């Protein structure tokens, strides 16, 4: 009787282990093959100084990453399939290669990605309310002040290391823009700059001035309102640098 019970107990344990192992394998497969709606239901667009970039995640698993002229960004044309791992937040590309993409955050109409160590924010091109948020006249950036920026945003408020941002065409008088506000964190030793360029009416004579400002000066610029700027992020989705932007037209 004792032997029979021991044998049945061992058999039960073996079956339980097999079932558990299969469950873990299936769960892992499910995580790595996800195609979540926050990726597939949007037309993700990144405003870049040279060419706007579109990254596409199809419901069927198709992947593409290209510029305004349809040209691939970097070596992205080596990949045409993707899957999303919800545990690691990694977007795995196929065929396997060196390109690495990780989701750092996703909020309403905003997606922050780490692409091979280059952190970029993408906006939903289907969202008409924020369609006017692209930076303008970057051809005047003769000194490459904004080169490599991660996002272009309205800076709404600052409280210590907390900073509230929104799409650059933010309208504080429109209550529907409230849902686009996002509380973000400044990295330790974040830097701030004020960049202003003067252009004459012909658009030919351009004088550009970019100077570093203190955190106190930056806070005042934000509290005075109408603060818009280029933003850089690190791999923790923390803001490392802001270049506040403005322009004047001289007679």
Regions found by a protein language model. Give the residues of each.
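Solvent-exposed hydroxyl-ligand-binding patches built from regularly spaced Ser/Thr
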Residues: 68, 72-74, 133-251
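Contiguous, well-ordered beta-strand patches that form the walls/edges
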Residues: 48-53, 64-119, 176-191
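Short, solvent-exposed coil/turn segments at beta-strand boundaries
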Residues: 37-43, 55-63, 86-88, 104-111, ...
């Amino acid at each position: 009787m004792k032997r029979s019970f021991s044998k049945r107990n061992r058999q039960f344990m073996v079956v339980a282990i097999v079932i558990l192992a299969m469950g873990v394998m299936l769960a892992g497969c499910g995580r790595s093959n996800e195609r979540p709606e926050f990726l597939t239901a949007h037309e993700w667009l990144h405003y870049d100084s040279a060419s706007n970039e579109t990254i596409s995640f199809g419901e069927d698993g198709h992947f593409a990453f290209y510029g305004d002229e349809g040209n691939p960004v970097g070596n992205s044309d080596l990949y045409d399939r993707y899957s999303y791992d919800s545990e690691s937040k990694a977007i795995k590309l196929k065929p396997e290669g060196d390109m690495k993409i990780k989701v750092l955050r996703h909020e309403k109409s905003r997606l922050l990605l780490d692409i091979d160590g280059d952190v970029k924010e993408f906006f939903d091109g289907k969202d008409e309310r924020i369609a006017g948020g692209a930076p303008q006249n970057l051809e005047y950036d003769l000194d490459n002040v904004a080169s490599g920026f991660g996002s272009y945003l309205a800076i709404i408020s600052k409280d210590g290391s907390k900073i509230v941002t929104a799409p650059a065409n933010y309208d504080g008088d429109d209550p529907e823009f409230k849902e686009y506000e996002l509380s973000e964190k400044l990295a330790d030793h974040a830097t701030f700059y004020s960049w202003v360029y003067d252009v004459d009416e012909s658009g030919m004579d351009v004088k550009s001035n970019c100077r570093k400002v203190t955190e106190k000066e930056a806070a005042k610029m934000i509290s005075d309102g109408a603060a818009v700027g280029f933003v850089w992020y690190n791999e923790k989705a923390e803001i490392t640098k802001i270049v506040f932007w403005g322009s004047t037209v001289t007679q």
